[in-house]
């Protein structure tokens, strides 16, 4: 006697879903799930923070330097941060490298603390808004460093905060400050980037590396080419760092961008200055009828705001 086995339901067939043939379904899932989640949580728009995953809080970086002074050893850097192994360097060189790294970590920790403070100020302000939807929610890539600092500051202010994490073989794990219901894990970078761009009304770029540059220039390009059907405020934080990394004036001089394009960027060096830029711009462009110094108005009734709760996709990108 034979037993008939029912075939696996297609949507429960894990090998198929993880196969090349199932890729389109995986991509679609990374589009539909965040959309459903943001509707359920009544998220209208966001302010996105970009920056290095490698910066630590000031107290943590200071303890590491103190430990190095006391014992000659500090918390080792992740493998992807280490440019050489002990086999490549002599003992004295290794010790000096560790000290240089520890001192740099303390110096760069100011950006962690500044991102934390800015996120706090922004969230504290948005929580005064009388709205059925959450406005200008602090959003990060969900990992450590500047991402953690942004989520941490927003959480400390008592607000919701979003983490759009990416699954990587190293470095990236969701930080503990993300609102649990707003922590999303992505496999595809391009879908994660879509959600950074889709709801954001402003971008704050802290010092960072390849990933930060990639994310910043993609959104800068979308803004320059007017592919975003909305006003996007871009704040570049830490002029000393960025002036060493970028020479945008050279692009103008060589004719590869227009001088007018430089106006897309606003530079700031303190959390208070960055917050002032964001508050003025967000109020002017996205809170109709509200003066920068006034209290928050009743729920805005513009078409984009109304469509954000409908089944249709709101027209924030062309």
Protein language model regions, located:
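Glycine-rich beta-alpha loop segments
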Residues: 3-8, 14-164
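Alpha-helical scaffold segments in soluble metabolic enzymes
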Residues: 27, 117, 121, 149, ...
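Solvent-exposed alpha-helices and their adjacent loops that cap or buttress functional pockets
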Residues: 39-42, 129-133, 155, 175-178, ...
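Short, solvent-exposed amphipathic alpha-helical segments in soluble enzyme
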Residues: 64-67, 155-156, 218-223, 250-253, ...
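Residue-level recognition of the N-termini of beta-strands and the immediately preceding loop/turn
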Residues: 134-137, 230-233, 262-265
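Phosphate/pyrophosphate-binding betaalpha-module
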Residues: 139-206, 210, 217
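Short, acidic/small-residue loops that bind anionic groups at enzyme active sites
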Residues: 158-171, 206-207, 220-244, 259-260
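C-terminal functional extensions of proteins
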Residues: 236-318
């Amino acid at each position: 006697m034979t037993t008939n086995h029912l075939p696996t339901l297609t949507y429960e067939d894990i090998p198929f879903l993880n196969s090349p043939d199932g890729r389109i379904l995986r991509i679609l899932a990374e589009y539909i799930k965040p959309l459903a989640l943001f509707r359920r949580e009544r998220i209208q728009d966001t302010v996105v923070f970009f920056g290095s995953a490698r910066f630590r809080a000031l107290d943590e970086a200071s303890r590491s330097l103190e430990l190095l002074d006391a014992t000659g050893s500090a918390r080792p850097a992740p493998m992807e941060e280490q440019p050489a192994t002990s086999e490549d360097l002599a003992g004295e060189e290794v010790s000096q490298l560790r000290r240089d790294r520890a001192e740099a970590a303390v110096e760069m920790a100011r950006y962690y603390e500044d991102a934390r403070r800015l996120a706090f100020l922004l969230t504290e302000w948005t929580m005064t808004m009388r709205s059925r939807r959450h406005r200008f929610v602090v959003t990060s890539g969900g990992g450590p460093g500047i991402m953690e600092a942004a989520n941490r500051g927003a959480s400390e202010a008592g607000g919701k905060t979003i983490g759009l994490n990416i699954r990587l073989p190293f470095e990236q794990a969701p930080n503990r400050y993300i609102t649990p219901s707003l922590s999303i894990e992505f496999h595809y970078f391009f879908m994660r980037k879509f959600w950074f761009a889709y709801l954001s009304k402003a971008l704050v770029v802290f010092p960072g590396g390849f990933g930060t540059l990639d994310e910043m220039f993609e959104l800068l390009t979308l803004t320059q080419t007017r592919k975003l059907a909305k006003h996007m405020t871009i704040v570049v934080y830490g002029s000393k760092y960025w002036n060493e990394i970028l020479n945008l004036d050279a692009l103008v001089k060589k004719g590869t961008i227009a001088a007018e394009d430089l106006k897309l960027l606003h530079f700031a060096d303190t959390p208070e200055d960055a917050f002032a830029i964001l508050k003025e711009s967000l109020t002017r462009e996205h809170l109709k009828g509200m003066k920068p110094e006034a209290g928050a108005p009743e729920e805005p009734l513009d078409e984009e705001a109304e469509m954000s709760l409908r089944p249709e996709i709101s027209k924030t990108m062309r």
